Amino acid sequence: MKKNKSTIILILVFFVGLSVMLYPTISDYVNQLHQTRAVANYAADVDKLSDADYTAYFEAADAFNAQIAADPDALYFPDRFPSYESTLDVTGTGIMGYITIEKIGVELPIYHGTSDAVLQVAAGHLEGTSLPVGGASTHAVISAHRGLPSAKLFTNLDQLEVGDTFTITVLDRTLTYEVDNISIVLPTETDSLKVSEGKDYITLMTCTPYGINTHRLLVRGRRITTPDKLKHIRVTSDAIKIEPILTAPIMALPLLLVLLFWLLFAPRKRSSAKDKTHKTH
């Protein structure tokens, strides 16, 4: 009986340890599933729009960006722009588009604002900056967390180098940006996020150093021509990536359950020495 109890305790400890080890991977997988479906649903809703709808949405976004460019303090007073939340909110869920960073395997929906609820699961657009629809004198800022145990998000953003590219898809428009500047600043140093006259920039922002988060990593991209192969990509909700580290434990789980059953219920033979002792009595 004591051996059975010890075996059960050891097995429970093993499974608890395995659960702790797998939590980040499983949580990230669930987040990727949510993100991919959100992007796929967005793309499906966008496909239902007419050319007139596209024109109206982009004209509203361009008008908003003109207001941002005309106000040098827009970043500090985003409340001056009450139309922000409704502009480009095609689905009514707050998604304005999505970002794809092929080098680090990232595809995230972009939501209005950078509330903690948004940044826990996706990328957020920084209020007071241009909407990411491109054009001269625009500078959009897209932010996401890194180092969360539940999601990768921008965890590997520091792997990007000058010359790498990323894309932003809004409605039926896919824009490509080439990284031209990488910097680390204090949270209060925001001048580099302002609009530069005539330039078309998007800056990706996250916390740094990893796990300490006292500064901000800024990866700026300048607009370049989008290759034809990227202009008509459609995302499907089945495009889910399963990490190898998750696959192995899932395959091993049935074997572990069989082992547990055998340890608990397999008949045990007494040793011959004990049998002889009992016979003499």
Where are these regions (language model features)?
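Intrinsic low-complexity, intrinsically disordered segments enriched in polar/basic residues
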Residues: 2-3, 277
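Solvent-exposed, non-transmembrane regions of membrane-associated and secreted proteins
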Residues: 3-244
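C-terminal single-pass membrane-anchor helix
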Residues: 234-281
